[in-house]
Amino acid sequence: MTKTSTCIYHFLVLSWYTFLNYYISQEGKDEVKPKILANGARWKYMTLLNLLLQTIFYGVTCLDDVLKRTKGGKDIKFLTAFRDLLFTTLAFPVSTFVFLAFWILFLYNRDLIYPKVLDTVIPVWLNHAMHTFIFPITLAEVVLRPHSYPSKKTGLTLLAAASIAYISRILWLYFETGTWVYPVFAKLSLLGLAAFFSLSYVFIASIYLLGEKLNHWKWGDMRQPRKKRK
């Protein structure tokens, strides 16, 4: 049975992410902000895509919580499996990647990722909501509830597919507009871009494996059992 406190926590997190998405959508209507959201609108930034991803995940999680309390676990195995797959392959790796990549680049040279002019446009609290608080929230999910991991091949393949899709969008936007989503890309040669994207995947794949280790450390082996061949 899902604990009431965990259900309440999931609902509060869902409300928080829903509020952030709504607030940012309203901010985009301000006359000062269209330049930031132009050429691909909100969906060119991994930060904002991550907020949407977390909202979807916690929406699924809340639905799973409610149905478990009303119907029991047997009737919603598919939903629980989807919840776990979404968290293990996307929600945890992406939010942790956004947190680490943003602050590493910010501390090295903020102009590569978040130019100072954005301080006059984006409130400090919103910056931290998008880039800082996402990590303790996703880490809390690891601690509060066990998640069944797929095989490494399946998990890393799904993560690679999502990474390729996002990189393809970045490149498409550049060829369409002549402007890079993030300033750091303008500093790199073609070879440098290839290396950056490759290392980014290695980084996020390492985060995926770390999530699996943390889950195993806290809850034991939760990997999905392999189907026996007939």
UniProtKB/Swiss-Prot annotation:
Site feature (Important for catalytic activity) residues:
T47, H131
Q: Name one GO biological process term.
A: negative regulation of leukocyte migration
Per the UniProt entry, the Enzyme Commission number(s) are 3.1.-.-
Annotated membrane topology? Multi-pass membrane protein
Top-level taxonomic group: Eukaryota
Documented effect of changing T47A: Loss of hydrolase activity
Activity regulation statement: Inhibited by N-hydroxyhydantoin carbamate JJH260 and beta-lactone KC01.
User: What protein family is recorded?
Assistant: Belongs to the AIG1 family.
Protein known as: Androgen-dependent TFPI-regulating protein
